[in-house]
Amino acid sequence: MSTSSSHRVAVVTGAGSGIGRACAIALAQAGYAVVLAGRRADALQETASAAGGGERLLAAPTDVTQPAQVDALFAAALARFGRVDLLFNNAGISANGIAFEDLTHDTWRSVVDVNLTGMFLCAQGAFRAMKAQSPRGGRIINNGSISAHAPRPDSAPYTATKHAVTGLTKSISLDGRAYDIACGQIDIGNAVTQMAARMTKGVKQANGAIAAEAMLDVARVAGAVVHMAALPLEANVQFMTLMATKMPFVGRG
């Protein structure tokens, strides 16, 4: 496979906002053709416009919890661009701030469906495309979280799914070796996004106190993902932890 990003095709899930939008724009600026996946068509179009528009950007509204829609996403990517070289497997939701004893089954399932099942379905779609195409191979980057290592209070569904993503990453990395498919994970702490905005106003700490936390410019995340993606397939960033330097992560769990 060519190492030139101008010949590569990326699929980005959760591309309508936050980390997904920032990474989709950065990949497009680096020369990738980018397929933008997310639930809201209007948000995907906003991302496409912010990335410069044009024929090398494809908005593909997708609910990652629905197998048929994920199949359609990768079919659209292949029909438009002929291959898939990169999946940034980013779509995710949280249900933080709910006491463990107050969690409902529906809330638990909604987080698991997006953060774990959706990530599996998208990784499988990319894996199948990468295995079958010529030249063979590609790269999958799963968006984990520092919650894959240490929980926050009242975050059981999110924390459990992010721990599970680490296992998924390891399994894909192992199973992909024979097909030149690399899989890595980026664990991000406190990037400035709409989802994480509450961090600046104060969130519950392990000791029960409420405190604001240091934040990280989402552009740093986008740069890290582009770096991981740009490596030749003989090299892989298996796990990267990228966090705000002064956030309370080390020592919290």
Name each region found by the language model.
Residues 61-73, 105:
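The beta1-alpha1 cofactor-binding region of Rossmann-like NAD(H)/NADP(H)-dependent oxidoreductases
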Residues 185-186, 204-250:
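C-terminal helical subdomain
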Residues 123, 161:
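Active-site helix of classical SDR
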Residues 145:
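Residue(s) in the substrate-gating loop at a strand-loop-helix junction
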Residues 16-18:
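Conserved glycine-rich cofactor-binding loop
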Residues 98-100, 107-109:
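Substrate-binding pocket helix/loop in short-chain dehydrogenase/reductase
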Residues 30-46:
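Conserved glycine-rich Rossmann-like NAD(P)H-binding loop of the short-chain dehydrogenase/reductase
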